């Protein structure tokens, strides 16, 4: 109690110091949660106040500070976060806090009628990055006159953090002058999230185009593997499993009917991510493992017999390593009716190699592929017909139709795409209400997909690419409009030293990637509650927010209310279970 009183007194004195002795001009500032996208001209709220957050151990939780000054531009603006101090002297070190500058992208075309042109926040430039721990040049910055500047503040709560109430301060400076001291409170629940996502993911990443964006051209395979490693690690830190990488399959020799595969370089690339050593004890999410990995095949496998032998070696190797349950064979992407016979033949050939090789196809359930498909991954639009709109999918297959496949130990994944906003068009009424990863949509749309995955009992989420805009000559930091959407297929931006400072190349995360991770963390709450009770208990919480695949509450306050109530319920039931155990 004395410690809490002392901290409160210190905070009060600091705030008095700011109000009496800060250099002019003083800022207008406010805080928001992570589900508000603040535009440059948004009107500041009338009340300045700090923020209160809630999180489990081994969870990231973010908020935003927005700065503005209408009288003049202000140079040398910086933000520093203190340690978070909690019960009985517990401390969450400020080294677990990352401060990001939110850069605006000027969008020239809307993604849909729900979108909009103008400046939207999305690229995040760290003050000190989590990958190389280098100070970057986004801070200090000049606060432009008459414009809002949002800052993303990300707190990681380490495993085994003592539950309870924590307090900290975010100090805003201009040069050496303190302009604001913003109180931050964090309540840590009595439970912990796992490091590895309970919902499987496979998000595409093309290391070849990433290298070209960072180096200007393809240089060599070592550089290709290196840039792929840092992006794959970045994805894992966001609870996402990347597939593709350098796109280099392990080499083989084929002599006298025998197939030999050299796994050395491949295992060095993927092994740490599959074994849980890519993120060590000193990293967030220690021991996190990727939940999926794709089979890479060779163009030089010129006969079916060679393909069968090569794929069989994949299964043997992955079985020996304990990785087999996460291996999938991406047979075909959105095949047409005319392509179905060929797709079925390729899938059957993979099963000829070994029936344990899981074949994935992005298609609704169809008799044309009956038999050799193990992972059905239809478009989210293909589960339900939206009333008043023409069917986007042919066919639309309801979720219950997949139940016989699940009883046969098959899996159902899904994905969202340009069908959420309109493919190469400004989408109309049909293209509203769906979960979406474009920039110019409400933040809840970027976060809600895992909630729907729980509601519909979906086993995994597929996404075609996280760096699609890297394939063009244009700088992704200036334009990520593709397939009719702003940011469609692009969740990262290239962090080049000549642009962001430092000595090393890193991926820059997007606000949307942060929100995807928030949704995956929400999913863990559903798992925890269902483990304490049953699945129906978690369903009731999800149903408060999600009605169907195209209808959910877009209001940030609704999501945060449900999440807080859900966390309190998990804590209450956990206490009750521990009490019965005693």
Language-model segments: which ranges?
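Bacterial N-terminal signal peptides that target proteins for export
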Residues: 1-9
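Hydrophobic helical h-region of N-terminal Sec-dependent signal peptides
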Residues: 9-15
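N-terminal signal peptide c-region/cleavage motif recognized by signal peptidases
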Residues: 18-20
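Ligand-binding face of N-terminal immunoglobulin V-set domains in extracellular IgSF glycoproteins
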Residues: 24-181
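Extracytoplasmic low-complexity repetitive segments enriched in small/polar residues
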Residues: 69-74, 83-85, 190-192, 254-261, ...
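C-terminal edge beta-strand
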Residues: 179-190
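Catalytic-core regions of glycoside hydrolase
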Residues: 199-473
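Catalytic domains of carbohydrate-active enzymes that cleave complex glycans
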Residues: 277-284, 290-303, 307-343, 348-365, ...
């Amino acid at each position: 109690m004395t410690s809490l009183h002392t901290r409160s007194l210190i905070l009060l004195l600091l705030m008095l110091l700011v109000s009496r002795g800060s250099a002019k001009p003083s800022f207008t500032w406010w805080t928001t949660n992570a589900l508000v996208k603040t535009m440059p001209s948004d009107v500041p709220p009338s009340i300045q106040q700090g923020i209160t957050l809630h999180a489990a151990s081994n969870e990231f939780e973010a908020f935003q500070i927005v700065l503005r000054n209408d009288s003049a531009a202000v140079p040398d603006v910086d933000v520093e976060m203190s340690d978070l101090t909690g019960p009985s002297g517990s401390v969450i070190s400020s080294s677990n806090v990352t401060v990001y500058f939110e850069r605006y992208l000027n969008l020239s075309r809307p993604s849909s009628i729900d979108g909009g042109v103008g400046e939207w926040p999305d690229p995040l430039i760290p003050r000190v990055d989590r990958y190389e721990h280098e100070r970057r040049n986004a801070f200090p910055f000049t606060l432009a006159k008459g414009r809002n500047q949002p800052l993303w503040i990300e707190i990681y709560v380490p495993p085994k953090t003592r539950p309870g109430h924590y307090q900290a301060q975010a100090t805003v400076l201009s040069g050496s002058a303190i302009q604001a001291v913003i109180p931050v409170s964090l309540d840590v629940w009595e439970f912990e999230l796992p490091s590895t996502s309970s919902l499987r993911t496979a998000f595409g990443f093309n290391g070849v185009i990433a290298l070209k964006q960072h180096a200007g051209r393809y240089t060599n395979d070592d550089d290709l593997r290196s840039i792929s490693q840092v992006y794959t690690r970045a994805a894992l830190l966001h609870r996402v499993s990347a597939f593709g990488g350098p796109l280099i399959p392990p080499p083989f020799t084929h002599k006298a009917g025998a197939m030999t595969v050299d796994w050395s370089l491949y295992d060095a690339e993927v092994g740490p991510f599959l074994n849980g050593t890519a993120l060590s004890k000193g990293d967030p999410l220690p021991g996190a493992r990727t939940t999926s990995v794709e089979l890479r095949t060779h163009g030089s496998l010129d006969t079916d017999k060679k393909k069968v032998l090569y794929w069989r070696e994949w299964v043997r190797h992955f079985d020996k390593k304990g990785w087999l349950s996460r291996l999938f064979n991406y047979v075909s992407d959105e095949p047409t009716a005319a392509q179905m016979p060929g797709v079925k033949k390729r899938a059957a050939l993979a099963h000829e190699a070994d029936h344990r090789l899981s074949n994935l196809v992005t298609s609704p359930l169809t008799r044309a592929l009956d038999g050799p498909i193990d992972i059905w991954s239809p478009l989210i639009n293909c589960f339900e017909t939206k009333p008043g709109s023409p069917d986007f999918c042919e066919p639309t297959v309801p979720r219950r139709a997949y139940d016989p496949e699940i009883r046969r130990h098959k899996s159902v994944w899904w994905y969202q795409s340009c069908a959420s906003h309109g493919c190469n068009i400004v989408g109309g009424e049909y293209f509203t209400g769906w979960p979406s990863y474009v920039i110019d949509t409400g933040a809840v749309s970027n976060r809600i997909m895992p909630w729907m995955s729980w509601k519909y009992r979906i086993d995994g989420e597929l996404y075609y690419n996280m760096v699609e805009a890297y394939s063009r000559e244009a700088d992704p930091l200036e334009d990520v409009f593709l397939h009719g959407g702003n940011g469609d297929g692009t969740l990262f931006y290239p962090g080049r030293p000549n642009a962001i400072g430092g000595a090393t190349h890193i991926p820059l995360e997007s606000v949307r990637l942060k929100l995807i991770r928030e949704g995956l963390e929400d999913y863990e709450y559903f798992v925890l509650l269902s483990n304490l009770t049953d699945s129906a208990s978690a369903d009731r919480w999800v149903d408060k927010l999600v009605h169907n695949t195209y209808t959910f509450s877009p209001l940030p306050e609704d999501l945060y209310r449900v999440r807080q109530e859900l966390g309190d319920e998990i804590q209450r039931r956990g206490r009750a279970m521990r009490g019965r155990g005693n």
